[in-house]
A protein has these predicted regions:
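His/Asp/Glu-rich mid-to-C-terminal helical/loop segments that flank catalytic regions of hydrolases
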Residues: 384-415
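Noncatalytic luminal/extracellular "stalk/propeptide" segments of secretory-pathway proteins
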Residues: 35-141
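Boundary at the C-terminal end of the N-terminal hydrophobic targeting segment
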Residues: 15-17
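Catalytic-core environment of secreted peptidases
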Residues: 19-34, 39, 50, 54-62, ...
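Metal-dependent peptidase/peptidase-like ectodomains
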Residues: 275, 285-385
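Sec-dependent N-terminal signal peptides
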Residues: 3-13
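Second-shell loop/turn segments in exported
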Residues: 32-42, 57, 69-72, 113-119, ...
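Soluble metallo-hydrolase cores and metallopeptidase-like ectodomains found primarily
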Residues: 110, 119-123, 171-252, 268, ...
């Protein structure tokens, strides 16, 4: 009896635990070897090969002859030198500053800073340009002065205009976030943390290169019993920002190694279930950070009839499910949202599941636009490491990844 009581006491605490494969996968996706899964050192290509291997190890099959669907796009990459100093003080890339992703290669030595006050029209900036010398001057703008949405629209347009003729420094509140661009401006733009900025001599060096990049979506399936009557599709983008210079890389744990790891965990659990008339498809997209390019290409070049999809679940940013989960399109697909909420109430995985309307903010978008019923699910929390080098695997709750995988399996099983 004592042994039985001990077993009953321990069981509730052993239902969920971090799966060693989940830990291994997210650590590898976020490793230096994969270089932030971007466009330097073949980072995204290495990640694609790795994900395909994980699918194969689970016994999943390719949708066609290969796990890969290739496509291409241009991107501005930063494969080499990157430095920025003020009065001889070398700043830390990714922490103290970032180089705007549309910046070109450049070597700067500027002694004269020109501070521009807040303005409400792009024309106000253009009028000041003839008085400045791009070989001597660098413009400084304080982002915190541009508060409203209209102000920010004007600021973005002005930066693009200024960079045609002059290097620019944007002062940022805290660590600036980084992005990816497909274009190059004439002059570089730097975003610098205000707390480390000072007036003085600016010296900087950037190596940037526009490349015609070959990328691959990774597509796998769990075959149905006989001809599939319908398909359930899980998606997650695996690409991230890569490297900003050779020495600074963005691991992208929450965005979106967490979603890829969760998707593979879901595949592992479904693979153990008896085969049914449903075919399960798992797609790891490339090119999301550049503008949803991988999912757009798939929808335009589908490997199966999109009308056969009963439901699609896109997983993007899943490191904070201890706070909540939000379903984009939750206010549109009421039946599925109610099913997800009720399933979570039974399983007690996350404190709250919120709904919101449609939004073109992740890889579900082109499927939804094509008439596919779909959710984009993301976790809550303040996401304080968004697009910064501190988005690391150690901060993702891997026990919650396993719990969310069980939630997803039960949810789609009820559709």
């Amino acid at each position: 009896m004592r042994k039985l009581l001990l077993f009953l006491f321990v069981l509730p605490f052993c239902v969920w635990a971090q799966h060693p494969d989940d830990v291994r996968i997210i650590n590898q996706l976020c490793s230096q070897e994969f270089s932030g899964r971007g466009y330097v050192n073949s980072g995204d290509s290495l990640a694609a090969e790795y994900i395909a291997l994980e699918f194969k190890k689970l016994g999943l099959r390719p949708q066609k002859r290969s796990f890969f669907q290739g496509f291409g796009f241009r991107v501005n990459a930063f494969p080499g030198k990157l430095s920025f100093s003020i009065n001889g003080n070398l700043l830390i890339p990714g922490k103290d500053y970032v180089v705007n992703p549309s910046s070109p290669s450049a070597k700067l030595d500027r002694e004269t800073m020109v501070f521009l006050d807040k303005f409400s029209r792009v024309e106000d900036v253009v009028e000041a340009l003839p008085q400045l010398d791009p070989a001597k001057h660098i413009i400084v703008l304080d982002k915190s002065k541009f508060i409203s949405r209209d102000d920010q629209i004007v600021l973005r347009a002005s930066i693009a205009k200024l960079s045609e003729v002059m290097p620019v420094i944007l002062l940022n509140e805290g660590t600036p976030i980084w992005h990816v661009s497909q274009n190059q401006w004439n002059f570089p733009v730097f975003e610098v943390d205000k707390t480390v900025f000072q007036e003085g001599v600016i010296k900087a060096e950037i190596e940037a290169k526009i490349i015609n990049h070959s990328a691959r979506n990774v597509v796998a399936r769990i075959k149905s019993k006989g001809k599939p009557r319908r398909r359930i599709v899980f998606t997650a983008h695996y690409d991230h920002l890569g490297r900003m210079g050779q020495n600074t890389f963005y691991p992208g744990a929450n965005d979106n190694a967490s979603g890829v790891t969760l998707m593979i965990a879901i595949a592992r659990k479904i693979r153990k279930l008896p085969r049914s008339s449903t075919e399960y498809v798992f797609i790891a997209f490339a090119g999301e950070e550049v503008g949803l390019l991988g999912s757009k290409f798939f929808v335009q070049n589908p490997m199966f009839d999109l009308k056969s999809i009963r439901f699609l679940v896109n997983l993007d940013i899943f490191g904070g499910a201890q706070h909540s989960i939000t379903a984009v399109n939750g206010t549109i697909y009421h039946e599925e949202f109610e099913c997800l909420v009720n399933t979570n109430k039974e399983m007690n995985v996350t404190p709250e599941i919120k709904s919101r309307g449609e939004s073109a903010n992740s890889d579900h978008h082109y499927f939804h636009a094509a008439g596919v019923r779909s959710f984009f699910l993301y976790s809550g929390g303040n996401n304080k490491h968004y697009h910064v080098p501190t988005d690391e695997a150690q901060d993702v709750d891997m026990i919650l990844v396993d719990k969310c995988a069980d939630l997803m399996v039960r949810f789609v099983g009820r559709l």
